[in-house]
Amino acid sequence: MTTQLSVNVNKIAVLRNSRGGADPDVVQAARACIAAGAHGITVHPRPDQRHIRADDVLALSALTRAQAVEFNIEGNPFAPPRAGYPGLLELCRATRPQQITLVPDGDGQLTSDHGFDFAQDTTQLAELITAFKQLGSRVSLFVDAGNPDIARAAALGADRIELYTGPYAHAHASGQADATLALFADAAQRASAAGLGINAGHDLSQANLGDFLAAVPGVLEVSIGHALISEALYQGLDASVRAYVDILRGSHVSA
């Protein structure tokens, strides 16, 4: 089995929102990614609507269903509704995505930069996971590779974890990836032993993805946005997506 690519289109919305109006069109960009071979589309709507908005989520849900690819909605399950943002649970009720990835990011964070602390996020998180799974969605929890309680995600009811790969990307860029890869491989093995599927995401790129997949067993899906869109500025969107698909074809999921 080949690791699946879910393209995060948040950065398309950032560019659109910086000018106002409808261009670039998030749905058109997502359609181009799917045509180039992406296996799914990811969005992370935030309460401040800095990029993906509620109407984008609805439109992309319709597109992914029509194209028969997976839709993955990321978000903070604890963030309350506010003007223009109905809350993660309500967005998911309206769209029933194939996967919901829960992320503990605060309103002021520039980007997601840490996973759940299972020593604290327990009872309320378990209740929310149950509510999301009642929609028929697969639930994944964003976690740090060094979290000693990764197996706790299974006890809380999650189906998968998403390994936060920012530290790996930083280590790879500085030529010091080996020790970090060992940490991620161990995390993946612990997750697999607990019966959890393994996703990965954050700062993965054409430069570092192949090395990551070669060292970390069982990665079912990678979610890639910032690097892919950045590379698309030079390569074109179609070519950028195809480059990732080629990397994934060169690696196979192993237990």
From Swiss-Prot:
Key word Transit peptide present: no
Site (Transition state stabilizer): 162
Listed pathway(s): Cofactor biosynthesis; pyridoxine 5'-phosphate biosynthesis; pyridoxine 5'-phosphate from D-erythrose 4-phosphate: step 5/5
GO cellular component: a single term: cytosol
Enzyme class, UniProt record, top EC level: transferase
Classification via InterPro entries: Aldolase_TIM, PyrdxlP_synth_PdxJ, Pyridoxine-5'_phos_synth
Quaternary data: Homooctamer; tetramer of dimers.
EC number, UniProt record: 2.6.99.2
Binding site for 3-amino-2-oxopropyl phosphate: 8, 19, 203, 225-226
Reactions catalysed according to its record: 3-amino-2-oxopropyl phosphate + 1-deoxy-D-xylulose 5-phosphate = pyridoxine 5'-phosphate + phosphate + 2 H2O + H(+)
Annotated gene: pdxJ
Cited Gene3D superfamilies: Aldolase class I
List of residues binding 1-deoxy-D-xylulose 5-phosphate: 46, 51, 111
Active site feature: 44, 74, 202
Family: Belongs to the PNP synthase family.
Superkingdom per UniProt: Bacteria
Species, as recorded: Xanthomonas euvesicatoria pv. vesicatoria (strain 85-10)
Function: Catalyzes the complicated ring closure reaction between the two acyclic compounds 1-deoxy-D-xylulose-5-phosphate (DXP) and 3-amino-2-oxopropyl phosphate (1-amino-acetone-3-phosphate or AAP) to form pyridoxine 5'-phosphate (PNP) and inorganic phosphate.
GO molecular function term, any single one: pyridoxine 5'-phosphate synthase activity
Subcellular location: Cytoplasm
One BP term from GO: pyridoxine biosynthetic process
Official protein name in the record: Pyridoxine 5'-phosphate synthase
